Amino acid sequence: MESVLQKIDDLEMKLSFQDISIEELNQEVIKLNALVARQQQQMLLMVNKLHSIEPSNMASSAEETPPPHY
């Protein structure tokens, strides 16, 4: 009978450790989701800034002087 009680205690201990591990992993997932969301916002801002650059400020490929080796 004692071995059954010992096995139950072992299982309860393992379950407790698993609960702690799951909660820690969940917190990491939450942090990473927030980080990804911030990075997506920053990327969107960068894309919008690139789209807002006036084409007149950039020379076309026809206007570019060729490199010296041509």
UniProtKB/Swiss-Prot annotation:
It comes from the Bacteria. Pfam families: SlyX. InterPro entries: SlyX. PANTHER family: PROTEIN SLYX. Belongs to the SlyX family. HAMAP family: SlyX. This is Protein SlyX homolog. It comes from Shewanella frigidimarina (strain NCIMB 400). The gene is slyX.
